[in-house]
């Protein structure tokens, strides 16, 4: 909260995404944004935008929120980074359910349902990128941990709709808790957003350089 009110997620994440785009482009990395204004795009439509542009990575920025049933929920804060896989804990399931419900509620539409064959093919495509997604999540979490004023909540996994149709290494970053006053102030500040953008951009560059070296080594005659 800032000045006693909960911040709208898009008011935080859109400026972050634009700053991140600028930092990535400084590092020679081209960026495709799924949206540049506070418009609603169904979760299942975002991955295909990246697929159509043959993107190498998919990064989704979000703000977390405490469960209203938690005691002292407003004190919960910190950063966590997710990749797509089966949730292992109740908290991972909670975050995935929260994110999966947001756009469906706001747009009054259901997440697109595919036929069984499409589901199987999608699962195969995601499994191919599971290790790469986990590696990217580790790098991003490590960089953000160094600048975030709250605790590191670690790298986690869950079934996020926004990641399911991105056929490439993909992560979702819960940058902080909008329900925590300190996290919200930091995420809403120019300095905080700059730290977030620089940290993620540095992690993405490190990831791309690592996998480029690994690919060159693998194909060396």
PLM features: what roles do these ranges have?
Residues 6, 67-68, 121-221:
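Active-site-adjacent mobile loop/cap segments within catalytic or ligand-binding domains
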Residues 1-114, 127-138, 194, 198, ...:
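Catalytic-core regions of hydrolytic enzymes
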Residues 116-120:
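Short, basic/glycine-rich phosphate-binding loops at helix/coil junctions
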């Amino acid at each position: 909260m800032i000045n006693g009110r909960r911040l709208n997620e898009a008011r935080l994440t859109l400026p972050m995404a634009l700053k991140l785009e600028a930092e990535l482009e400084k590092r020679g990395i081209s960026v495709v944004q799924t949206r540049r204004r506070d418009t609603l795009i169904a979760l299942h439509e975002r991955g295909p935008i990246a697929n159509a542009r043959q993107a190498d990575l998919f990064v989704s920025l979000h703000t977390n929120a405490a469960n209203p049933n938690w005691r002292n929920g407003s004190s919960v804060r910190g950063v966590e980074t997710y990749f797509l896989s089966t949730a292992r804990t109740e908290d991972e399931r909670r975050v995935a359910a929260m994110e999966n419900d947001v756009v469906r509620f706001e747009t009054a539409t259901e997440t697109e349902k595919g036929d069984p064959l499409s589901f199987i093919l999608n699962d195969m495509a995601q499994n191919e990128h599971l290790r790469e997604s986990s590696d990217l999540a580790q790098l991003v979490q490590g960089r953000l941990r160094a600048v975030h004023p709250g605790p590191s909540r670690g790298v986690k996994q869950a079934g996020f709709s926004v990641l399911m149709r991105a056929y490439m290494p993909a992560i979702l970053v819960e940058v902080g808790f909008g329900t925590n006053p300190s996290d919200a102030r930091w995420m809403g500040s120019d300095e905080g957003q700059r730290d977030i953008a620089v940290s993620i951009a540095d992690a993405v560059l490190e990831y791309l350089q690592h996998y480029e070296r690994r690919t060159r080594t693998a194909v060396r005659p």
